[in-house]
C-alpha cells in the first residue's frame, strides 16, 4: 500500500527462467471473484507461445459471486473482503497450500495510456544495461499525474542516433540513445481500495496488473501480438481493451459498461427479477435473430411471489431486440476508443473478445461488422490441469495473471525514493519541467 503514496502500484520480481515458482492469481471483478494457484516450471520454448519460459500447471482454483463490487471498484469493503476470502480459501484447499501473496487484476479506475519519448547522450560508446536503465528512467519519470497511479511502464521501441525500430540496443554504438515509452495509469483511489480489501485478508499484493493486458497474455499467440491485435475484455461492470503490436502492450483503455447493463435491460424489458434476467441471458442470450426466433418462446417467471401471478412467455426475437442495442452501444464505444490508439490501425488489425460478456451467441459476427475487423473469441492458452469450466473466455484474466510473472521483466519502474521526488506540489507540468531540466 505504501507504494501507492508515490503513484506506483506494486510490481513483482520477474520469475527466473531457470527456477520453478508457485504463483497465486486473484481476479476481483464485478460479478465474480476468481483465485487460481499454479506451479510454474521451466520448459523449452513452444512453437506458438515462444515468449513463455515456463509451463503452467494449475493446482488450485476457487471462485464465488462477487460482493461489494460495482464497475470493478470496491463499493462495500466488508462484503468484498468476504468474497475474496471465500475464493482464496477454496483455491488453497484444492492446492493443499497456504498462500501469502497474489498477483491482482484491476479493470476499474478509468484505465488510460500515454506515450512518452526521451533521449540521452551516450558519447559514441556502446549501449550498456546502465544506459538502458537511464533512458527508461528518463522516459517514465514525468508520467505521473495527480490522482493517478502507474500500472505499467513499458518500452515500445528504442532509437539509435534518431533511427527507430531498434528492439535490442545492447552493445550498439551510438551518440544519442532514445526510447518510446508506453505508460498505463489508473485512478489511485480505485487501486488503493482494491488493495485494501485484499490486504484485509492477510494477503500481500505482489503485483497489480491491468485486466485487458493479462487477458491478452493468456489468449494471444506470439504472431498475433507481433502483427497487431486488440483484446477486448467484456466484464460485468466494465469493458476494457488492450492493443498489442510488435509483441508489446501499446495501448489500454476502458469504460464502465458491461454485461450487467445487458442484464438490467432484460430485467426492465421483461419485467423480471435480476437473477431471472441473468439466467435468461446466460441460457438464451443472442445478438442475432434466427429463422424461428419469432416462434421460439422463453418462460419468464413472475416478478412477485404472489401465487396468483403467472409466468409470461416471450419470443427469442423479443429478447434479441432488448440485448442487441446495448451490445451495439458497447461495441461502438470500443470502436471509438480503438480509433484513438496512437498506433492504429496496425495495433488493431484483428480483435479478440474475452470476458463473460463475450459469450453471447452471434457476438463475433456483430463485432466484426461494427469494428470492421476480424473478430474471434479468446480462450486461455497453455494452462495444464485446468478444468473445463475455466477454459472459456470468462476466465482469461485470471489465467493471464498466471502468465504475467514471465512478462514482468519487460516493465520499468524507478526506485521509490526517486519517484517520490516527482510527487511534489508543483503539479504535472512542473514535474515535466523538472524532467526536462534533469534529462537534457
Model-assigned labels for residue ranges:
Residues 334, 353, 401:
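Hydrophobic, well-ordered secondary-structure elements that form the walls
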Residues 346-349, 379, 392, 398:
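Hydrophobic multi-pass inner-membrane translocation pores used for secretion
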Residues 221-223, 356-370, 391-392:
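Short glycine/threonine-rich loop-to-helix capping motif typified by GTGT followed
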Amino acid at each position: 500500500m505504501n507504494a501507492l503514496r508515490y503513484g506506483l502500484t506494486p510490481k513483482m520480481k520477474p520469475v527466473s527462467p531457470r527456477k520453478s515458482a508457485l504463483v497465486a492469481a486473484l481476479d476481483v471483478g464485478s460479478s465474480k471473484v476468481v483465485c487460481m494457484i499454479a506451479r510454474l516450471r521451466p520448459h523449452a520454448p513452444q512453437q506458438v507461445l515462444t515468449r513463455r519460459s515456463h509451463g503452467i500447471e494449475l493446482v488450485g482454483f476457487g471462485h464465488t459471486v462477487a460482493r461489494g463490487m460495482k464497475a470493478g471498484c470496491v463499493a462495500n469493503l466488508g462484503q468484498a473482503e468476504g468474497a475474496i476470502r471465500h475464493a482464496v480459501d477454496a483455491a488453497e484447499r484444492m492446492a493443499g497450500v497456504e498462500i501469502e501473496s497474489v498477483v491482482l487484476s484491476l479493470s476499474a479506475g478509468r484505465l488510460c495510456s500515454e506515450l512518452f519519448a526521451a533521449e540521452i547522450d551516450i558519447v559514441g560508446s556502446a549501449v550498456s544495461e546502465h544506459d538502458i536503465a537511464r533512458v527508461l528512467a528518463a522516459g517514465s519519470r514525468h508520467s505521473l499525474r495527480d490522482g493517478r497511479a502507474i500500472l505499467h511502464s513499458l518500452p515500445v521501441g528504442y532509437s539509435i542516433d534518431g533511427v527507430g525500430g531498434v528492439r535490442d540496443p545492447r552493445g550498439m554504438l551510438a551518440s544519442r540513445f532514445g526510447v518510446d515509452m508506453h505508460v498505463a495509469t489508473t485512478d489511485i483511489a480505485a487501486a488503493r481500495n482494491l488493495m485494501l480489501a485484499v490486504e484485509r485478508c492477510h494477503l500481500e499484493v505482489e503485483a497489480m496488473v491491468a485486466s485487458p493486458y493479462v487477458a491478452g497474455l493468456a489468449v494471444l499467440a506470439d504472431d498475433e501480438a507481433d502483427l497487431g491485435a486488440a483484446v477486448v475484455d467484456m466484464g460485468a461492470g466494465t469493458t476494457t481493451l488492450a492493443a498489442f503490436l510488435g509483441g508489446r502492450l501499446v495501448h489500454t483503455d476502458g469504460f464502465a459498461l458491461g454485461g450487467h447493463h445487458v442484464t438490467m435491460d432484460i430485467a426492465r424489458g421483461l419485467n423480471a427479477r435480476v437473477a431471472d434476467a441473468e439466467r435468461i441471458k446466460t441460457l438464451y442470450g443472442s445478438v442475432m435473430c434466427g429463422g424461428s426466433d419469432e416462434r421460439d418462446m422463453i418462460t419468464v417467471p413472475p416478478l412477485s411471489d404472489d401465487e396468483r401471478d403467472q409466468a409470461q412467455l416471450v419470443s427469442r426475437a423479443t429478447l434479441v431486440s432488448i440485448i442487441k442495442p446495448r451490445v451495439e452501444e458497447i461495441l461502438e464505444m470500443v470502436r471509438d476508443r480503438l480509433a484513438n490508439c496512437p498506433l492504429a490501425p496496425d495495433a488493431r488489425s484483428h480483435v479478440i473478445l474475452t470476458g463473460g460478456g463475450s459469450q453471447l451467441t452471434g457476438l463475433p459476427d456483430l463485432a466484426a461488422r461494427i469494428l470492421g475487423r476480424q473478430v474471434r473469441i479468446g480462450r486461455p492458452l497453455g494452462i495444464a490441469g485446468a478444468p473445463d469450466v475455466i477454459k472459456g473466455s470468462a476466465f482469461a484474466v485470471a489465467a493471464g495473471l498466471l502468465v504475467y510473472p514471465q512478462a514482468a521483466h519487460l516493465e520499468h519502474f524507478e526506485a521509490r525514493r526517486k519517484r517520490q521526488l516527482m510527487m511534489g506540489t508543483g503539479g504535472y507540468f512542473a514535474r515535466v519541467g523538472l524532467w526536462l531540466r534533469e534529462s537534457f
